[in-house]
Amino acid sequence: MVRAAVSLCGIELDNPVIPASGTFGHGYTFAELYDIDCLGTFSFKGTTREQRLGNAQPRIAEAPGGMLNAVGLQNPGVDAVIAEELPRLKQVFHKPVMANVSGFSIEEYVEVCRKLDACEQVGWLEVNISCPNVHGGGLAFGTDPKAAASVTRAVKAAVKKPVIVKLSPNVTSIADIARACEDAGADAVSLINTVLGMRIDLRAKRPLLANKTGGMSGPAIFPLAVRMVWQVYEAVRIPIIGMGGVTRAEDVLELMLAGATAGGGGAANLVNPYACRDIVRDLPQAMQNYNIQNLKDIIGGAHHG
């Protein structure tokens, strides 16, 4: 009998399948389709201090092998998430959940994380450092090791629960960013976030997205995710959550061999709302097909092959 359980920052997961933030909402809508308790956990939609209405339309564009999005962190704000979204989730999900946090200043990250840290349902805080730093010329925190470390250090000092830093792939060396976050106290890292891209409407002769650029997700970016998980695994000793183009159980196994402790789908949930349930269902057979008895034994296994 195969063993699919893994441990993430001291919390045991039944399996390593973790739907990525942004495409799984706050979970309860998917619970109308299937029992979401089958998942290892999931990361809910990015939360900011204030309500955000998001970017102008159109926000979504098709792309070869995936899609572009520029939703713009639309969410009701942290107080509404705690008062309205988490109680609804508690009725249908009976495991610790990952709270994804976005901010435009270190102070905002700290305030939002501190509030979510006090919520019983929240098991981990996932800090999305792909946001622009309004006090740093607008560059994303995640593009500079010092800025990434500053956010990580400030959040760690303010909370008790494990801090996972979500890394941007739009950098010269993701390993350097990961190492800076680890040195600043991060308990884990998650990667990759979407890859910056653009599509242009040939008839209108202007960008398809109102925001001009957007984040590319879907199967086309999966090899990038594998490469970056590999590089980060060689740079740090903290756990890695792998994501980016995951659509099937074999993809999760591949990310784990590259160094991830867990992995999950993002855009796949928009194509097939049952995608992550199907990955959980198919995982034991995929393990048998590749002679894998215990998932904990294969983490980073390709580095020793």
Regions found by a protein language model. Give the residues of each.
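N-terminal capping/small domains of soluble enzymes
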Residues: 1-97, 102-104
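Surface-exposed amphipathic alpha-helices with a cationic face
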Residues: 6-7, 11, 82-93, 117, ...
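Short glycine-centered, acidic/aromatic-flanked micro-motifs in structured strand/loop junctions
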Residues: 21, 101, 129, 167, ...
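Short acidic/polar active-site loop segments enriched in Thr and Asp
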Residues: 39-40, 45, 95, 122-125, ...
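Short secondary-structure boundary segments
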Residues: 45-47, 129, 193-194, 267-268
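C-terminal helical cap(s) of enzyme catalytic domains, especially alpha/beta-barrels
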Residues: 55-64, 200-214, 256, 268-293
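Alpha/beta enzyme core
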Residues: 104-241, 247-262
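A short, charged, Gly/Pro-tolerant segment at domain boundaries
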Residues: 296-305
